[in-house]
Curated annotation (Swiss-Prot):
Keywords assigned: Ribonucleoprotein, Ribosomal protein, RNA-binding, rRNA-binding
Described purpose of this protein according to its UniProt entry: One of the primary rRNA binding proteins, it binds specifically to the 5'-end of 16S ribosomal RNA.
The protein's name: Small ribosomal subunit protein uS17
GO molecular function: rRNA binding; structural constituent of ribosome
Superkingdom, natural source: Bacteria
InterPro entries: NA-bd_OB-fold, Ribosomal_uS17, Ribosomal_uS17_bact/chlr, Ribosomal_uS17_CS
Gene this protein is translated from: rpsQ
Organism field: Lacticaseibacillus paracasei (strain ATCC 334 / BCRC 17002 / CCUG 31169 / CIP 107868 / KCTC 3260 / NRRL B-441)
Subunit structure as annotated in this protein's UniProt entry: Part of the 30S ribosomal subunit.
GO biological process, one term: translation
HAMAP family assigned: Ribosomal_uS17_B
Length: 87
């Protein structure tokens, strides 16, 4: 049997948990500008499947790529790295 391709794993911050079983995670990366060589900060938002509604806004989470779960969801929650501090 052929080996399955490795799935992408990202770490990011939960920016929204208002949907049922879905969270929005913002993943930030740093890339070099091709001409000027300056380090630029980029961020991208992903819809992530959260089966038990455990993640809350502000948490740092790890997400993994998976099969399409809906029109926009292609990631699932692996674990919560750090809980948000409630003030």
């Amino acid at each position: 049997m052929a080996e399955r391709n490795s799935r992408k794993v990202y770490q990011g911050r939960v920016v929204s948990d208002k949907m049922d079983k879905t969270i929005t995670v913002e993943v930030s990366t740093v890339k070099m500008h091709p001409v000027y060589g300056k380090r630029m900060k980029y961020s991208k938002k992903y819809y992530v499947h959260d089966e038990d509604n455990t993640a809350k806004t502000g948490d740092i989470v790890r997400i993994a790529e998976t099969r399409p779960l809906s029109r926009n969801k292609r990631f699932r929650l692996l674990n919560i790295v750090e809980k948000a501090v409630i003030i």
